Amino acid sequence: GLWQKIKSAAGDLASGIVEGIKS
């Protein structure tokens, strides 16, 4: 559903931020 899509997008965003901090 919509909530699953929101959670998925939030997870992708968080992963991107973490990768940005690491590098």
UniProtKB/Swiss-Prot annotation:
Free-text tissue specificity from the UniProt record: Expressed by the skin parotoid and/or rostral glands.
Record GO cellular component, one term: extracellular region
Record has Secreted as a keyword: yes
Subcellular location: Secreted
UniProt keyword terms in alphabetical order: Amphibian defense peptide, Antibiotic, Antimicrobial, Secreted
Swiss-Prot/TrEMBL GO biological process terms: defense response to bacterium
Function: Antibacterial peptide, that adopts an alpha helical conformation which can disrupt bacterial membranes. Each caerin displays a different antimicrobial specificity.
Family statement drawn from the similarity comment of this UniProt entry: Belongs to the frog skin active peptide (FSAP) family. Caerin subfamily.
Protein name: Caerin-4.1
The organism of origin for this protein: Ranoidea caerulea (Green tree frog)
Taxonomic path: Eukaryota, Metazoa, Chordata, Craniata, Vertebrata
